[in-house]
Amino acid sequence: MAITAKPKAGVWAVLWDLLTTVDHKKIGLMYTATAFFAFALAGVFSLLIRTQLAVPNNQFLTGEQYNQILTLHGATMLFFFIIQAGLTGFGNFVVPLMLGARDVALPRVNAFSYWAFLGAIVLALMSYFFPGGAPSVGWTFYYPFSAQSESGVDFYLAAILLLGFSSLLGNANFVATIYNLRAQGMSLWKMPIYVWSVFAASVLNLFSLAGLTAATLLVLLERKIGLSWFNPAVGGDPVLFQQFFWFYSHPTVYVMLLPYLGILAEVASTFARKPLFGYRQMVWAQMGIVVLGTMVWAHHMFTVGESTLFQIAFAFFTALIAVPTGVKLFNIIGTLWGGKLQMKTPLYWVLGFIFNFLLGGITGVMLSMTPLDYQFHDSYFVVAHFHNVLMAGSGFGAFAGLYYWWPKMTGRMYDERLGRLHFWLFLVGYLLTFLPQYALGYLGMPRRYYTYNADIAGWPELNLLSTIGAYILGLGGLVWIYTMWKSLRSGPKAPDNPWGGYTLEWLTASPPKAHNFDVKLPTEFPSERPLYDWKKKGVELKPEDPAHIHLPNSSFWPFYSAATLFAFFVAVAALPVPNVWMWVFLALFAYGLVRWALEDEYSHPVEHHTVTGKSNAWMGMAWFIVSEVGLFAILIAGYLYLRLSGAATPPEERPALWLALLNTFLLVSSSFTVHFAHHDLRRGRFNPFRFGLLVTIILGVLFFLVQSWEFYQFYHHSSWQENLWTAAFFTIVGLHGLHVVIGGFGLILAYLQALRGKITLHNHGTLEAASMYWHLVDAVWLVIVTIFYVW
C-alpha cells in the first residue's frame, strides 16, 4: 500500500474524508474540537448566568430562561466537555500512539461513537426550536420535576441515552485496545501513566453508567407512556431515582478526573526532566479510586432522610477516597520536586491545578461530614467546591493536555506569551469567580436562585465580585481562541519532539502520518519511558517494511448508522410514542448495520497481533457486557427493593409460568446451538456452522413471538400504569426483549456474512461478539424467570 497517500484537496473531499474516516487521530481531533467547542458554549451560558446574578432583582433573564441556561450550562460542561476532552478526545489521538499501535481495536465502532456523541449534543441543543424550549430541570433532572415539566426534557433524556451508548462503545474500545494492541514487549506495568488513567476511567464508566441509563430510561418511560417506578401515587419511591442517578453521577466525577491526572503526570514528568515519582503507587491509587468511586454516591443524599448508619457508611468512604486521590496529587508534586523545571505553558496549568485542586479536595472532605453537609447542602459552597474540582481541576488539566499535545496534533507551535496570558487570566478569573461563592454558601445563598433581594447582607457585593471574575474568565477564553487561531494560521512548524518527551507519541511525525510509525519498534520496554531507555542503551530504530503496514478502510456506514439512530431519538423525543417515524428510522438504522457488516474492513485479509490472543471483537464485547450486566443488576436491585418493602405487590393474575418455562427451553436451547455452531466454525465445518446459526436465529424468533403474545395478553388484562409490580415487569422483561432483538439481529448479521463468504476459519466476523451477547441474554432470562414468574 502507499503509506504516504493523502486525501484529495478541496472542501468536499475533506468533508467526505471526515465523514468516512476511521483513523483514530482524525477521530480524536474531532472529539477534541467538539469538546472544546462545548466548553466555549458552556462558558457563554455561564456568562449569562453571572450577568443575571451581578445585581439584586435583575431582570436580564426571566426565571424560566435562567433555569434553561443553567441546565444547558451544566449538561454541556459535564457531559460534552469534561468527560470527552480528557478521555475520548486526547485518548483517541494519543493512546494508540503511546501503545505503539496503528489504530484502536475497533476503528469503525470508534467512528460510530464519535458521530453518536455529536448527535447527542445536537439533540440536547435543538430543544430550543421545539415548543416548550430547552430543558429547565437542572442537569440532574430530579424526579418528580422532570416528569412534570413541559420543557425540552424529552430531548435532554434522549440525548443522555444516545451519549451513554456512544460512551459505552468508546470505553469498551479503549479497554480492548489497551489489553490487545500494546506493542510487543510492553507489559501493563510499562504503559505510560496516561494510558493507565484512560483504562481506569473506562472501566469505572462501563460499570457505573448503568445508574444514569436506568434513571434516564425510567423517567422517559413515565413521560412517554406513563410507566412509573418513582411515583408515590402508585407506590413508587422518588428517592430511588436519586440512588440510580448518583450511583453513576458521583463515580463520573472520577471519570472526569482520572484522565486529567494522567495528563498532568505526563506533563510534570516531561517538564521536570525526570521519571514520574511513585509510578506503581500512582497506578494502584487510580485503581483504588475505581473501586472506592462506586461506594460514595449517597453522600449527595445525606438530607433525604436515610438512616444514620447509611449516612455514616457513605461519609466514611467519602473521606477514605481522599487517600488515593491525595496519593496521586503528591505523586505529581514529588515528580516536580528537585526537577529541572522548564516553565512552558503546559507546566503552568499543572501548577495552577495543584493549588486549586487541593482547595477543592479539602472542601470535599468537609462535605463528607454529615453535619457540615446539612448546613451547606444545595448552597453556593457546594457550587464553589465542585468548580474547584472540575473547572480548576479537570478544566486546567484539559488545557495542560491541549497545550502539551497541540504541536503533535496540528504540526504547529503556538505563542508561549499568549498561552501564559491565557493561564493567568483563567487563574485570576477563576479565583475571583468562585472564592466569593464559598462565602456566599456560608451566608446561606442557595444554588439555582435566579435573583435575590438587595437587603441580604453580603450577597450583592459577593455576587458582583463573582461576576467580574466570570468576565475575566471570558476574556481568557478569547485569548485562548486567538492563540489557537494564530497557531493554525501562522505558527512555526513543530518538530517531532518539541518538549523532549519520553513516550512513544513523540517518536512520530508532527502531525503523525496515517500509519503512525515509520520504524519497527524494539521489543524491550525497560520502563514507561521507552524513548529515554532506548536512547540511553543506544538502541537503533530500524525502518518498518511497508508491506507489514495495514490500515483499515474508510467507511461511510458508521456515520450513516449514527445519523439514523440520531433521527430515531429525535422522533422519540419530539412525537408521541410509538410513532411511524421512529420505526422508519429504526429500519434505516438496521439497513446501515447490514451494509456495515457486509463491508470489508481491510482491503485484503490481515492477521492481527493481539497481546492476549483474543480477538478485538471478543475483548470489546466482553467489556461491553460488563455495562449490560450493570444495567440489569441496578434495575433488578431497584425492583427487589420495591418488592421487599411491600410497594411492588404482584397482581392476582400474572403471566403464566408455563409460557416462561417454554421460553426458557427455547432460549437455553439456542445457547447450545450457537455454541456448537461456533465450535463447528473453528473446526472448518462450514455447512454445520451455518445450519446451527440458522437454528439459533429461529429459536430466538420463536422466543420473541411467544414473549410478544404474552405481553399483548398481559397488557390488556393488567393495570400497568397503576401497579408497581406490573410496571417493573414490563420494564425489565421488556428491556430483556429488546436485548433479544439486538442479539438476534447480531446473529442475523453473522449469518449474512457467512452466506457472503466473509466468515472464514480465521475471520469470524461479528459471530464471536454476537454469540457472547446471546449467552448474556440467556443468563439474564434465567434471573428474570426466577424473580417475576417463580417468586
Swiss-Prot record:
Biological processes per GO annotation: electron transport coupled proton transport; oxidative phosphorylation; respiratory electron transport chain
Source organism, top-level taxon: Bacteria
EC supergroup of this enzyme: translocase
Chain positions recorded as heme a3 binding sites: 385
CDD domains xrefs: Heme_Cu_Oxidase_III_like (cd00386)
Subcellular location(s) of the protein: Cell membrane
Region of interest called COX3, as start-end residue ranges on this chain: 545-791
CC cofactor note: Binds 1 copper B ion per subunit.
TM regions (residue ranges): 29-49, 78-98, 111-131, 155-175, 201-221, 244-264, 282-302, 312-332, 347-367, 381-401, 423-443, 464-484, 566-586, 617-637, 657-677, 691-711, 729-749, 771-791
Keyword Coiled coil: no
One GO MF term attached to the UniProt entry: heme binding
Cofactor entry: Cu(2+); heme
UniProt: Fe(II)-heme a binding residues: 73, 387
Gene Ontology terms: cellular component: plasma membrane
EC number: 7.1.1.9
Family listed: In the N-terminal section; belongs to the heme-copper respiratory oxidase family.
Complex formation: Possibly a heterodimer of A-protein (contains: cytochrome c oxidase subunits I and III) and subunit II. The A-protein could also present a precursor form of subunits I and III.
Protein name: Cytochrome c oxidase polypeptide I+III
Natural source organism: Thermus thermophilus (strain ATCC 27634 / DSM 579 / HB8)
